[in-house]
């Protein structure tokens, strides 16, 4: 099962993802408290997503993360808690800009490919960093 978690602001995007992913997906964005989100994430095999509260919750409850990072701040500054995570981040000429709005259409994030994320996820699963018996 694929699950989207997040706040109320993530509900519409979560619904787009749920539709794209098909019947094995659930959109729980905007429906759960932080404690509820942590419990759902604790039951997951892995978290795949960007640097958000959900990523930090996943790391705190021991769920391995494929964490997608922009290059706006310093490497390692906001990575998920604990060991056994895969961090995807690409350096660009504007790395360390600290800008909230990117004038280059999020170039550093767009350099991260779906294939790259899938390879990282498979590496987590194969390495045994995943939790067994979880969805």
Task: Label each region the model flagged.
Residues 133-135:
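Intrinsically disordered, low-complexity segments enriched in serine/threonine/proline/glycine
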Residues 1-68:
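Donor-binding and catalytic core of enzymes assembling or modifying cell-surface/extracellular glycoconjugates
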Residues 18-20, 24-28, 59-131:
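Nucleotide-sugar donor-binding patch of glycosyltransferase catalytic domains
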């Amino acid at each position: 099962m694929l699950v989207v978690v997040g706040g109320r602001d993530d509900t519409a995007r979560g619904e787009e993802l749920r539709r794209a992913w098909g019947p094995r997906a659930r959109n729980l964005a905007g429906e759960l408290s932080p404690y509820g989100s942590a419990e759902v994430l604790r039951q997951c095999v892995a978290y795949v997503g960007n640097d958000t509260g959900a990523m930090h919750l996943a790391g705190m409850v021991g769920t391995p993360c494929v964490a997608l990072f922009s290059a706006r701040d310093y490497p390692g500054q906001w990575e998920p808690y604990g060991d056994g995570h895969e961090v995807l981040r690409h350096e660009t000429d504007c790395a360390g800009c600290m800008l909230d709005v990117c004038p280059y259409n999020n170039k550093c994030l767009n350099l991260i490919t779906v294939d790259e994320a899938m390879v990282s996820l498979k590496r987590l699963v194969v390495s045994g960093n995943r939790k067994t018996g979880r969805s």
